[in-house]
Protein backbone atom coordinates (compact mmCIF):
# COMPACT_ATOMS: atom_id res chain seq x y z
CA UNK A 1 0.00 0.00 0.00
CA UNK A 2 1.30 3.46 -0.90
CA UNK A 3 2.37 5.62 2.01
CA UNK A 4 0.54 8.84 2.77
CA UNK A 5 2.27 12.14 2.06
CA UNK A 6 1.58 15.64 3.35
CA UNK A 7 0.55 18.76 1.45
CA UNK A 8 4.23 19.81 1.53
CA UNK A 9 5.51 16.67 -0.21
CA UNK A 10 6.32 18.53 -3.43
CA UNK A 11 8.44 20.97 -1.43
CA UNK A 12 10.34 18.14 0.28
CA UNK A 13 11.09 16.61 -3.13
CA UNK A 14 12.31 19.95 -4.47
CA UNK A 15 14.72 20.19 -1.52
CA UNK A 16 16.02 16.65 -2.16
CA UNK A 17 14.87 15.40 1.23
CA UNK A 18 15.73 11.89 2.34
CA UNK A 19 12.53 10.12 3.31
CA UNK A 20 11.63 7.61 6.00
CA UNK A 21 8.55 5.47 6.52
CA UNK A 22 6.85 6.69 9.67
CA UNK A 23 3.84 4.47 10.30
CA UNK A 24 1.48 5.02 7.37
CA UNK A 25 3.42 8.07 6.21
CA UNK A 26 6.41 8.86 4.04
CA UNK A 27 8.08 11.80 5.81
CA UNK A 28 11.33 13.76 5.36
CA UNK A 29 14.06 12.35 7.59
CA UNK A 30 16.66 14.97 6.69
CA UNK A 31 17.70 17.48 4.04
CA UNK A 32 21.31 18.47 4.76
CA UNK A 33 21.92 15.92 7.51
CA UNK A 34 20.53 15.30 10.98
CA UNK A 35 23.51 16.79 12.82
CA UNK A 36 23.41 20.03 10.83
CA UNK A 37 19.64 20.37 11.23
CA UNK A 38 19.88 19.68 14.96
CA UNK A 39 22.40 22.50 15.33
CA UNK A 40 20.29 24.84 13.18
CA UNK A 41 17.41 24.50 15.64
CA UNK A 42 19.69 24.87 18.67
CA UNK A 43 21.40 28.01 17.32
CA UNK A 44 19.01 29.79 14.93
CA UNK A 45 15.67 28.57 13.50
CA UNK A 46 14.35 25.62 11.53
CA UNK A 47 10.93 24.38 10.52
CA UNK A 48 9.42 20.90 10.53
CA UNK A 49 6.50 19.57 8.52
CA UNK A 50 4.46 17.75 11.19
CA UNK A 51 1.27 17.56 9.15
CA UNK A 52 1.13 13.80 9.67
CA UNK A 53 -0.17 14.59 13.17
CA UNK A 54 -3.92 15.01 13.64
CA UNK A 55 -5.93 18.24 13.89
CA UNK A 56 -9.37 17.81 15.44
CA UNK A 57 -11.64 20.81 15.96
CA UNK A 58 -13.92 20.50 18.98
CA UNK A 59 -16.58 22.99 20.00
CA UNK A 60 -16.28 24.55 23.43
CA UNK A 61 -19.53 22.87 24.52
CA UNK A 62 -17.71 19.50 24.50
CA UNK A 63 -15.04 20.52 27.00
CA UNK A 64 -16.53 18.79 30.04
CA UNK A 65 -16.77 15.48 28.18
CA UNK A 66 -13.12 15.72 27.14
CA UNK A 67 -12.05 16.54 30.69
CA UNK A 68 -13.39 13.17 31.82
CA UNK A 69 -10.95 11.43 29.46
CA UNK A 70 -7.63 13.18 30.21
CA UNK A 71 -5.40 13.46 33.27
CA UNK A 72 -5.06 17.27 33.17
CA UNK A 73 -7.40 20.11 34.02
CA UNK A 74 -8.71 21.58 30.77
CA UNK A 75 -11.85 23.41 31.90
CA UNK A 76 -10.13 25.89 34.22
CA UNK A 77 -7.13 26.85 32.09
CA UNK A 78 -7.59 30.31 30.54
CA UNK A 79 -8.75 30.88 26.99
CA UNK A 80 -5.90 31.21 24.48
CA UNK A 81 -3.71 28.74 26.33
CA UNK A 82 -2.14 25.46 25.21
CA UNK A 83 -2.15 22.30 27.31
CA UNK A 84 -0.08 19.12 27.12
CA UNK A 85 -2.02 16.15 28.47
CA UNK A 86 -2.58 12.41 28.20
CA UNK A 87 -5.67 10.43 27.26
CA UNK A 88 -5.88 7.47 29.65
CA UNK A 89 -7.84 4.23 29.45
CA UNK A 90 -9.75 2.40 32.17
CA UNK A 91 -6.49 0.99 33.58
CA UNK A 92 -4.87 4.42 33.73
CA UNK A 93 -2.48 3.64 30.87
CA UNK A 94 -1.71 6.11 28.10
CA UNK A 95 -3.81 6.05 24.94
CA UNK A 96 -1.93 9.07 23.59
CA UNK A 97 -0.14 12.22 24.69
CA UNK A 98 -1.61 15.25 22.98
CA UNK A 99 -1.68 19.03 22.79
CA UNK A 100 -4.83 21.11 23.20
CA UNK A 101 -5.07 24.66 21.83
CA UNK A 102 -7.84 26.54 23.62
CA UNK A 103 -9.54 29.42 21.79
CA UNK A 104 -12.62 31.52 22.58
CA UNK A 105 -15.10 29.29 20.78
CA UNK A 106 -13.28 26.04 20.09
CA UNK A 107 -10.45 23.69 20.95
CA UNK A 108 -7.89 22.22 18.57
CA UNK A 109 -6.75 18.75 19.63
CA UNK A 110 -3.47 17.48 18.16
CA UNK A 111 -2.97 13.70 18.55
CA UNK A 112 0.05 11.74 17.36
CA UNK A 113 -0.17 10.47 13.78
CA UNK A 114 -0.17 6.80 14.76
CA UNK A 115 -2.98 7.36 17.26
CA UNK A 116 -5.34 9.60 15.29
CA UNK A 117 -7.85 6.89 14.41
CA UNK A 118 -7.71 5.49 17.94
CA UNK A 119 -8.39 8.90 19.51
CA UNK A 120 -11.21 9.62 17.06
CA UNK A 121 -12.82 6.29 17.97
CA UNK A 122 -12.29 7.01 21.67
CA UNK A 123 -13.98 10.40 21.37
CA UNK A 124 -16.91 8.90 19.48
CA UNK A 125 -17.33 6.16 22.10
CA UNK A 126 -17.61 8.85 24.78
CA UNK A 127 -19.97 11.05 22.73
CA UNK A 128 -17.48 13.83 22.04
CA UNK A 129 -18.26 15.53 18.73
CA UNK A 130 -15.40 16.76 16.56
CA UNK A 131 -14.50 17.86 13.04
CA UNK A 132 -11.40 16.23 11.56
CA UNK A 133 -9.39 19.03 9.92
CA UNK A 134 -6.30 16.88 9.31
CA UNK A 135 -6.67 16.57 5.53
CA UNK A 136 -7.71 20.19 5.02
CA UNK A 137 -4.79 21.77 6.87
CA UNK A 138 -1.04 21.60 7.40
CA UNK A 139 0.90 21.82 10.65
CA UNK A 140 4.36 23.38 10.64
CA UNK A 141 6.59 23.67 13.72
CA UNK A 142 9.07 26.57 13.62
CA UNK A 143 11.69 26.10 16.33
CA UNK A 144 14.86 27.72 17.58
CA UNK A 145 16.14 30.75 19.53
CA UNK A 146 15.84 33.13 16.54
CA UNK A 147 12.30 32.06 15.61
CA UNK A 148 10.33 34.77 17.40
CA UNK A 149 12.45 37.63 16.02
CA UNK A 150 12.19 36.22 12.50
CA UNK A 151 8.42 35.73 12.31
CA UNK A 152 6.99 38.47 14.52
CA UNK A 153 6.32 40.81 11.58
CA UNK A 154 3.59 38.40 10.42
CA UNK A 155 2.58 36.68 13.67
CA UNK A 156 1.61 38.41 16.90
CA UNK A 157 3.58 36.23 19.29
CA UNK A 158 1.76 35.00 22.41
CA UNK A 159 3.35 34.08 25.72
CA UNK A 160 4.84 30.61 26.01
CA UNK A 161 2.25 27.84 25.94
CA UNK A 162 -0.36 30.30 24.70
CA UNK A 163 -2.34 30.45 21.47
CA UNK A 164 -3.25 33.12 18.96
CA UNK A 165 -4.72 33.40 15.48
CA UNK A 166 -4.83 35.51 12.36
CA UNK A 167 -7.31 35.42 9.50
CA UNK A 168 -5.42 32.52 7.91
CA UNK A 169 -3.59 30.77 10.75
CA UNK A 170 -4.11 29.22 14.16
CA UNK A 171 -0.90 28.90 16.16
CA UNK A 172 0.61 28.30 19.58
CA UNK A 173 3.95 28.99 21.21
CA UNK A 174 4.68 25.32 21.70
CA UNK A 175 7.06 22.71 20.33
CA UNK A 176 8.86 19.41 20.74
CA UNK A 177 12.52 20.41 20.69
CA UNK A 178 13.25 22.16 23.97
CA UNK A 179 13.63 25.45 22.08
CA UNK A 180 11.34 28.45 21.80
CA UNK A 181 9.09 28.56 18.77
CA UNK A 182 5.58 28.24 17.39
CA UNK A 183 3.47 25.54 15.78
CA UNK A 184 1.27 26.85 12.99
CA UNK A 185 -1.91 25.33 11.56
CA UNK A 186 -2.85 26.62 8.11
CA UNK A 187 -5.45 25.73 5.52
CA UNK A 188 -4.03 23.86 2.54
CA UNK A 189 -4.55 26.84 0.23
CA UNK A 190 -2.35 29.00 2.49
CA UNK A 191 0.56 26.55 2.54
CA UNK A 192 2.58 28.09 -0.29
CA UNK A 193 2.36 31.56 1.21
CA UNK A 194 3.55 30.25 4.58
CA UNK A 195 6.43 28.31 3.02
CA UNK A 196 7.53 31.36 1.04
CA UNK A 197 7.47 33.51 4.16
CA UNK A 198 9.56 31.03 6.18
CA UNK A 199 12.16 30.40 3.49
CA UNK A 200 12.54 34.11 2.67
CA UNK A 201 13.33 34.63 6.36
CA UNK A 202 16.17 32.13 6.00
CA UNK A 203 14.47 29.51 8.16
CA UNK A 204 15.72 26.08 7.08
CA UNK A 205 13.68 22.88 6.65
CA UNK A 206 14.50 20.11 9.12
CA UNK A 207 13.51 16.45 9.14
CA UNK A 208 12.25 13.93 11.66
CA UNK A 209 15.79 12.70 12.33
CA UNK A 210 16.78 15.92 14.07
CA UNK A 211 13.35 16.22 15.67
CA UNK A 212 14.07 12.95 17.48
CA UNK A 213 17.56 13.94 18.67
CA UNK A 214 16.22 17.33 19.79
CA UNK A 215 13.32 15.85 21.79
CA UNK A 216 15.59 13.27 23.44
CA UNK A 217 18.11 15.96 24.36
CA UNK A 218 15.20 17.86 25.95
CA UNK A 219 14.04 14.67 27.76
CA UNK A 220 10.66 14.64 26.00
CA UNK A 221 8.71 11.38 25.61
CA UNK A 222 7.80 9.68 22.34
CA UNK A 223 4.56 7.72 22.17
CA UNK A 224 5.22 4.07 21.43
CA UNK A 225 8.46 4.21 23.42
CA UNK A 226 8.21 6.13 26.72
CA UNK A 227 4.41 6.00 26.60
CA UNK A 228 2.24 3.06 25.54
CA UNK A 229 -1.06 1.43 26.44
CA UNK A 230 0.91 -0.50 29.09
CA UNK A 231 2.42 2.57 30.78
CA UNK A 232 0.75 5.14 33.04
CA UNK A 233 1.70 8.84 33.24
CA UNK A 234 3.21 8.16 36.68
CA UNK A 235 5.43 5.38 35.32
CA UNK A 236 6.53 7.65 32.45
CA UNK A 237 7.65 10.33 34.97
CA UNK A 238 4.85 12.61 33.79
CA UNK A 239 3.13 13.07 37.14
CA UNK A 240 3.29 16.85 36.60
CA UNK A 241 0.48 16.44 34.04
CA UNK A 242 -1.91 15.08 36.69
CA UNK A 243 -3.78 18.31 37.43
CA UNK A 244 -7.29 16.90 36.93
CA UNK A 245 -8.74 16.55 40.44
CA UNK A 246 -11.96 14.93 39.21
CA UNK A 247 -12.68 11.28 38.50
CA UNK A 248 -11.36 10.76 34.99
CA UNK A 249 -10.87 7.51 33.12
CA UNK A 250 -8.25 5.42 34.96
CA UNK A 251 -7.76 7.94 37.78
CA UNK A 252 -8.24 5.37 40.55
CA UNK A 253 -5.14 3.38 39.57
CA UNK A 254 -3.12 6.52 38.84
CA UNK A 255 -3.93 8.00 42.25
CA UNK A 256 -2.83 4.77 43.93
CA UNK A 257 0.50 4.92 42.10
CA UNK A 258 1.04 8.49 43.25
CA UNK A 259 1.01 7.33 46.87
CA UNK A 260 3.21 4.28 46.24
CA UNK A 261 6.72 3.59 44.99
CA UNK A 262 5.90 0.02 43.98
CA UNK A 263 5.82 0.60 40.23
CA UNK A 264 8.19 1.00 37.30
CA UNK A 265 9.45 4.50 36.50
CA UNK A 266 11.23 6.21 33.61
CA UNK A 267 14.78 7.44 34.18
CA UNK A 268 17.11 9.41 31.95
CA UNK A 269 20.84 8.76 31.66
CA UNK A 270 23.91 10.14 29.90
CA UNK A 271 26.38 7.57 28.56
CA UNK A 272 30.03 8.57 28.59
CA UNK A 273 30.36 7.35 25.03
CA UNK A 274 29.22 8.11 21.49
CA UNK A 275 27.73 4.62 21.22
CA UNK A 276 23.96 4.70 20.68
CA UNK A 277 21.95 2.44 22.98
CA UNK A 278 19.15 0.58 21.23
CA UNK A 279 15.98 -0.91 22.68
CA UNK A 280 17.23 -3.68 24.95
CA UNK A 281 16.94 -4.91 28.50
CA UNK A 282 19.24 -3.63 31.23
CA UNK A 283 20.35 -6.13 33.85
CA UNK A 284 22.37 -6.31 37.04
CA UNK A 285 23.88 -9.62 38.16
CA UNK A 286 21.82 -11.45 35.57
CA UNK A 287 18.53 -9.91 36.70
CA UNK A 288 16.54 -7.66 34.36
CA UNK A 289 16.12 -4.20 35.89
CA UNK A 290 14.82 -2.16 33.01
CA UNK A 291 14.29 -1.58 29.30
CA UNK A 292 15.90 1.04 27.10
CA UNK A 293 12.98 2.92 25.52
CA UNK A 294 14.96 5.52 23.54
CA UNK A 295 18.61 6.11 22.79
CA UNK A 296 20.45 8.50 20.52
CA UNK A 297 23.51 10.70 20.18
CA UNK A 298 23.39 14.24 21.56
CA UNK A 299 25.21 16.62 19.20
CA UNK A 300 25.34 19.32 21.88
CA UNK A 301 26.77 17.13 24.64
CA UNK A 302 28.82 14.96 22.25
CA UNK A 303 27.59 11.99 24.29
CA UNK A 304 24.75 9.48 24.05
CA UNK A 305 21.45 9.81 25.91
CA UNK A 306 19.05 7.05 26.90
CA UNK A 307 15.67 6.67 28.54
CA UNK A 308 15.21 3.53 30.68
Name each model feature, range by range.
Residues 63, 99-222:
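Acidic, low-complexity central loop/insert segments
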Residues 1-88, 93, 209, 301:
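Acidic, proline/glycine-enriched N-terminal capping motif
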Residues 50-54, 96-97, 105-107, 137-138, ...:
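Short, surface-exposed beta-edge/turn micro-motifs
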Residues 72, 78-83, 116, 155-164, ...:
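Glycine-centered loop/turn motifs
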Residues 231-237, 241-306:
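Glycine-rich, small/acidic residue-mixed loop/short-helix segments
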Amino acid sequence: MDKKTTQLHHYHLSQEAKFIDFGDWSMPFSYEGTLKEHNIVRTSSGFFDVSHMGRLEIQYSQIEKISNLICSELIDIPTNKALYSIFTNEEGNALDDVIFWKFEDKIILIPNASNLDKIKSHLTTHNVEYIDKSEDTVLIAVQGPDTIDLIQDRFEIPDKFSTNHTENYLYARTGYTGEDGVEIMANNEDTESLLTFLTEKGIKPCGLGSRDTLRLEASLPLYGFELTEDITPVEASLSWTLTNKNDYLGSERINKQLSSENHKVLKKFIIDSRKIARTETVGIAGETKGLVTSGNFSPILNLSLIHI
